[in-house]
Amino acid sequence: MKRIAFVFSTAPHGSASGREGLDALLATSALTEALGVFFISDGVFQLLPGQKPDAVLARDYIATFKLFDLYDIDQCWICAASLRERGLESVNFVVDATPLEPVALRRELGNYDVILRF
């Protein structure tokens, strides 16, 4: 079976992209275990705890990331450079994601047959 990477690169709540990506990821996890999840650029904001989306009349889907364990999604990486650029190096995110420098992240992403970006 093909290995599928889900790349989150947009901030939450500004568009439906993050929510749709998460829905697609959870649905795909029912079909295969060959999944990887990557958070790069503004996508690192998807994993911030304590968001208040109701203030901008958005749905709170961020808590759904906590279901990764239930869905056996354990291959999760976050861009270390993106964290530094945004001052988020010491944040406890809603999921355990392994920080990787951009070169290592691209190498890991290269191991996947299909890349879906949200």
Swiss-Prot record:
Q: Know the name of this protein? A: Protein TusC
> Which PANTHER family does this chain map to?
PROTEIN TUSC
Q: Which UniProt keywords apply?
A: Cytoplasm, tRNA processing
SUPFAM superfamilies recorded for this chain? DsrEFH-like
> Which GO biological-process labels does this protein carry?
tRNA processing
Where in the cell?
A: Cytoplasm
Q: Does the keyword tRNA processing apply?
A: yes
Q: Does the keyword tRNA processing apply?
A: yes
What's this protein's function?
Part of a sulfur-relay system required for 2-thiolation of 5-methylaminomethyl-2-thiouridine (mnm(5)s(2)U) at tRNA wobble positions.
Specify one Pfam family.
Answer: DsrE
Q: Which domain of life is it from?
A: Bacteria
Q: Give the lineage.
A: Bacteria, Pseudomonadati, Pseudomonadota, Gammaproteobacteria, Enterobacterales
| Predominant cellular place of this UniProt entry's protein | cytoplasm
Would you identify the family this protein belongs to, as annotated?
Belongs to the DsrF/TusC family.
**Mind naming one GO cellular-component term on file for this protein?**
cytoplasm
Q: How does it assemble?
A: Heterohexamer, formed by a dimer of trimers. The hexameric TusBCD complex contains 2 copies each of TusB, TusC and TusD. The TusBCD complex interacts with TusE.
